[in-house]
């Protein structure tokens, strides 16, 4: 906390005006004092969080999730039977590759795991594209928040093509951007239902195309198509997609056709808002999160994996 801030405030006010503006000066001083105290408290909390995450990083154990036979990470643990799920994350173009990279970098799982991840290829726009399971923006771009593949690499090219495919898969009003999200249908407890939506042209799985667009999906693509993303955000705002906590979860052009227009999913999901804020931070503050993550020595050891052609 700057102990001299009151003197600095006094020096900014000419002596003749101090009496006249005494109350205003008092309020300004009090406000600055509160700001300094609040900033100091935040700094202390950040230091505590840093120590906690450092310890967690050292102690995290991937052995319970690593299938030593398949050399893949299981999607979870059956806690009743204390067994790994038989299903594994087995595709390179997946949000799970961030976990794969981190676990390899920390020496928690062998590097050969990376090469066990499948790379199903197709051609789109006369370019090679590595497919994802559901054709979502999330699968291609979420890992980019922390570590972005080298330009002209296979992952970078695939992400660029995926963004273009997502742009073309749009509503009549030009809205685009699809990932897993809530949609305009309700479960027995009157909560919005939730599942993955994607673009069929970039997906391995087969499904009926449904146009449910989520703002976070668009924001993840900011660095690949900044102008198109901002135009898309403007369209979302024009469709009433802003609330007290930012943009609403999604706009559903599929399940509300009988009502004569799209349905807004009036909810906010913390992890989607978090991804949006992270993507905006990287875009506006010179890739701050990416630089912070990449500055760790263990990350540098695996960056070569992202140069795959």
Question: Which residues are covered by each model-predicted region?
Answer:
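Ser/Thr/Asn(+Pro)-rich, low-complexity disordered segments
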Residues: 1-309
């Amino acid at each position: 906390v700057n102990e001299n801030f009151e003197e600095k405030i006094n020096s900014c006010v000419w002596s003749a005006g101090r009496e006249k503006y005494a109350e205003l000066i008092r309020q300004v001083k009090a406000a600055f004092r509160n700001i300094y105290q609040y900033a100091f408290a935040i700094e202390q909390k950040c230091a505590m969080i840093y120590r906690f995450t450092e310890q967690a990083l050292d102690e995290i154990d991937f052995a319970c999730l690593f299938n030593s036979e398949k050399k893949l990470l299981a999607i979870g643990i059956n806690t009743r039977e204390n067994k790994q799920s038989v299903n594994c994350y087995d595709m390179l173009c997946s949000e799970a590759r961030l976990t794969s990279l981190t676990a390899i970098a920390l020496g928690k799982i062998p590097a050969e795991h990376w090469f066990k991840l499948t790379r199903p290829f197709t051609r789109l726009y006369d370019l090679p594209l590595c497919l994802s399971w559901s054709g979502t923006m999330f699968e291609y771009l979420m890992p980019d928040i922390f570590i972005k593949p080298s330009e002209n690499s296979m992952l970078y090219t695939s992400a660029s093509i995926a963004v273009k495919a997502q742009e073309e898969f749009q509503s009549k009003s030009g809205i685009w951007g699809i990932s897993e999200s809530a949609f305009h249908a309700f479960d027995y407890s009157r909560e919005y239902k939730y599942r993955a939506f994607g673009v069929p042209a970039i997906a391995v799985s087969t499904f009926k195309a449904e146009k449910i667009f989520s703002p976070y999906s668009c924001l993840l693509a900011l660095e690949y198509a900044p102008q198109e993303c901002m135009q898309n955000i403007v369209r979302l705002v024009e469709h009433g997609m802003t609330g007290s906590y930012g943009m609403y979860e999604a706009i559903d052009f599929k399940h509300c056709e009988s009502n004569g227009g799209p349905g807004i999913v009036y909810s906010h999901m913390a992890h989607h808002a978090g991804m949006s804020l992270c993507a905006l931070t990287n875009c506006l503050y010179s890739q701050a999160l990416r630089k912070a993550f990449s500055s760790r020595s263990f990350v540098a050891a695996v960056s070569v994996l992202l140069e795959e052609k």
